[in-house]
Amino acid sequence: MTGRILSITVDLTPTVQNHAGLGRYAEEITRALFASCQPDERMCAFYTDPHRRRLSPPLDQLPASTLTLPNKLWRSKVMLAYALHLPQNQAIGQPDVFFATDHLLPYLPGAIKHFLLADLSFLSHSQTHTFLNRTFLQLMVPRFLRAADAVIAISQCTLQEALSRYPFIGNKGYVAYPGVGQHFRPVLDPARLDSVRARYHLPERFVLYVGTIEPRKNLVMLLGAFRQASLADLKLVIVGKRGWLFQEALARVHELGLEDQVIWTGFVPDDDLPALYSLAQVFAYPSLFEGFGLPVAEAMACGTPVLCSNTSSLPEVAGDAALLLPPTDVCAWSQALVRIVQDVSLHADLRERGLRQAKRFTWEASANLVRALYRELYARHP
């Protein structure tokens, strides 16, 4: 370094707008970078939000450049900026480093640009995106990847798929895993467990799912497997906000006559999730594909046995600490649910393996990688 202050701006738009996966990643990686900020660094934030929401502590301490544009309008402006080569520093400032976390990289010539790549579902599972979102991502992500100085994937699976589709990424591709928050650990305090159980009207024993309610999460299959398992003393608790085409899962509950067996909690704040995981007999995650699959790691960190799909990045996250199954095999999932619940030895083994596996994923390690990257690039920057 030359003695001048290095300005790093992170796009926290997905955090402010409460986007589940990208929002969590952007918030936590920024917290970790901010907590370990070097004397010659200045952390800043950028976000756009038409509802004028604010960042929560401690990120509200960051100097911030903000816009109130709707997402579609902001995307249009970025597309126009690339087409006409119009720098967007007036909106964002003059960062030395810009970390794009929302699959959107503003046109910032001269800045060192990190681009976070969560997944390539807009290509591999395009049916899970709206037409406009799919079209934008298919058109612009290749341009963003070319413009980026470093492409940061959230799993090896995502990086390898990106390299196969966009070989020009070459040696500027890296992996910085999402981390498991330090508060995700087994909850043993009976008072806290009872409080969370009462708050969400939870039964004594249940199977747990945590995630957005949308088709790619494959809840329709899980509901069928749960019904087939016929575990009379267990209910299914579904935690998460309603996403795109959530009605399919709701309709399936009625078709199967599971109204009294399924509990929908809606969104649950982060502070309550460790107790929810700790109360569950098993965590089930039947997603068709994931860029990472953070709930799997969080459940393991809380000592909850995990049953998840054997697709995309999930085997990478779960390692040997979960039962992995094809996401479309209803019978296999039904049998696995019964097995985990009834086999005390298996239940204990998965718990211990999961606790060890979850320790692999920390925000501090990923923040250290991101920092090392931008400092190396800055040192070589003309």
Cite the ranges covered by each PLM segment.
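Carbohydrate transferase catalytic cores enriched for Leloir-type hexosyltransferases
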Residues: 1-382
